[in-house]
């Protein structure tokens, strides 16, 4: 049973999922739950490439034995994919902390390379990305989960623009480690409907079940139907491996069973 989440750590990032230059911003709603024995990743499936072009995509990813969800600039045409930064970070030897730090470093370098290229080849797209990154939110946020020696580990990487500059800096959180001893819940993307439901209910709430997590994301779906949409996919990682708690039919990850 999850402890009351009123004491949970909360992170917010206005999500921008892009797949083509000059694509418009799009929202997402994702949740990462962590306890001593398991990690749960959940996300909606709506992406918006332009005002008149949306699609349904799985927002849960498998990179080797690492599972992730991405909020923010998940990909930009063929020039940038946030999952490549995860592949870089976890592709070398080291501890889980080292891998998360490597992911953050790679993410910074890849974003810098993208912006440098756009500044030289497509100034309009460059200005559009910088304008978008000026919002008071994380430009890219990743939640990565891996089972290390039968212990599920969670890493959060937040990439935010340095105020007034075309530079980005990354911050990392490791669980267990920087996180407290209790369970935590991390929100990625829209959460203004979820937050009062969870934190201001007047009594402790638990969100351990797939049905509870689904309900939270549907609150944001109702509030932002153009940017947050079904199906909602939920996976659980514990010391034995990963399994689906809910699969809407659009996620196919070889390492996740039932």
Name what the model sees in each region:
Residues 10-20:
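Bacterial N-terminal signal peptides
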Residues 1-12:
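Bacterial N-terminal signal peptides that target proteins for export
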Residues 24-258:
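N-terminal nucleophile
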């Amino acid at each position: 049973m999850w402890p009351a989440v009123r004491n949970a750590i909360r992170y917010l990032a206005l999500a921008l999922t892009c797949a083509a230059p000059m694509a418009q911003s799009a929202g997402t709603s994702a949740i990462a739950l962590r306890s001593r024995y398991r990690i749960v990743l959940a996300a909606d499936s709506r992406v918006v490439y332009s005002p008149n072009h949306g699609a349904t995509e799985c927002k849960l990813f498998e990179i080797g034995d690492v599972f992730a969800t991405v909020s923010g600039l998940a990909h930009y045409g063929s020039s940038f994919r946030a999952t490549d930064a995860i592949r870089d970070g976890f592709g070398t030897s080291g501890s889980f902390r080292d891998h998360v730090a490597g992911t953050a470093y790679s993410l910074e370098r890849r974003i810098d390379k993208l912006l440098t290229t756009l500044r030289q080849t497509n100034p309009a797209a460059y200005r559009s990305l910088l304008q978008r990154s000026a919002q008071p939110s994380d430009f890219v946020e990743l939640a990565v989960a891996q089972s290390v020696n039968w212990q599920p580990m969670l890493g959060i990487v937040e990439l935010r623009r340095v105020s007034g500059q075309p530079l980005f800096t990354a911050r990392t959180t490791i669980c267990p480690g920087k996180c407290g001893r209790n369970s935590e819940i991390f929100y990625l993307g829209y959460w203004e409907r979820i937050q009062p439901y969870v934190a201001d209910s007047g009594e402790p709430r638990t969100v351990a079940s797939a049905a509870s997590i689904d309900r939270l994301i549907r609150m944001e779906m109702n509030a932002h139907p153009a940017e947050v949409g079904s199906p909602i996919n939920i996976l659980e990682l514990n010391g034995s491996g990963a399994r689906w708690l809910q699969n809407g039919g659009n996620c196919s990850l070889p390492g996740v069973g039932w």
